[in-house]
Amino acid sequence: MSINDKPIGFFDSGVGGISVLKEAFKLLPKEDFLYYGDSKNAPYGTKKVEEVKALTFNATDFLMNKGIKALVVACNTATSVTINDLRENYDIPIIGIEPALKPAVELNKGGKIIIMATPMTLAEKKFANLMDLYKETEDIEPLPCPGLPELIEQGIVSGDVIYNYLKDKFSKYDNEKISSIVLGCTHYPFIEETLKEVTHNKACIIDGSFGTSRELKRQLKNSNMLREENRVGKVTIFNSREDKDIIDLSYKLFNMK
């Protein structure tokens, strides 16, 4: 098999990275994708750094053994902790994801920018460096959201539980003064509709899925690794939990409009 015909690997701590996979499949419809969700060990956002590194390398080895030509680390926490180590150890294009703060700043008209993310993403040096670029000129507030990925892992993406969780998190803010909300975890796009409801559609909601997918395409094109055959690609999903319910949920989220 030529390198062009090999699949693209996607990895996340659970089902969240499927939000990025959806964007990538739209942008690269001829490609085959292998997705590995580590729901057995989710969430990563409250774990120790060394544990996240070990789990990320395990997932990467799983996908490398399947013959992938590129890897997308579709997990903000794993990206912030492990991306440099991965690039040093594997000789394929490796694309990470980080909170889409730059587009939020570019769209900002003087309001508050809120970054929703896991506690670990917000605590990492990579995030601090990102904040340093803009903190002098922008009103940016990190909002840790522990427990939210766990709800989404259970398939709870709407309804009273999600609404009340978000209502509580945003109760301290004046919706009129929020310019943008950056979704700094790949699980969060699945609760975007409820988030709009809670914030009365006042804020622009931004996630990094499109930017990450565009970077994936750019790197594959520059390396002459894009699939050329005129065909419709396929998506195959694996999960460390190895039960039918989590695989069914994964495909359901992938097909969710």
Curated annotation (Swiss-Prot):
List the catalytic activities from the record: L-glutamate = D-glutamate
Show the active-site residues: C75 (proton donor/acceptor), C185 (proton donor/acceptor)
* Binding annotation for substrate: D12, S13, Y44, G45, N76, T77, T186, H187
Q: What is its EC number?
A: 5.1.1.3
Protein's GO biological process: cell wall organization; peptidoglycan biosynthetic process; regulation of cell shape
Keyword terms of this UniProt record: Cell shape, Cell wall biogenesis/degradation, Isomerase, Peptidoglycan synthesis
Supply the enzyme class, top level. isomerase
Q: In which pathway does it act?
A: Cell wall biogenesis; peptidoglycan biosynthesis
SUPFAM superfamilies per the UniProt record, alphabetical: Aspartate/glutamate racemase
Where in this chain does the entry annotate a coiled-coil region?
A: none
Pfam family for this entry, one: Asp_Glu_race
Is GTP-binding a UniProt keyword of this protein?
no
Tagged with keyword Cell wall biogenesis/degradation: yes
Q: Name one GO molecular function term.
A: glutamate racemase activity
Tell me which domain of life the UniProt entry assigns to the organism this sequence originates from. Answer: Bacteria
> HAMAP family attached here?
Glu_racemase
Spell out the NCBIfam families in the cross-references.
glut_race (TIGR00067)
Q: Which family does it belong to?
A: Belongs to the aspartate/glutamate racemases family.
UniProt function note: Provides the (R)-glutamate required for cell wall biosynthesis.
Put simply, this protein is called Glutamate racemase
Species: Clostridium botulinum (strain Langeland / NCTC 10281 / Type F)
Q: What is the lineage of its organism?
A: Bacteria, Bacillati, Bacillota, Clostridia, Eubacteriales
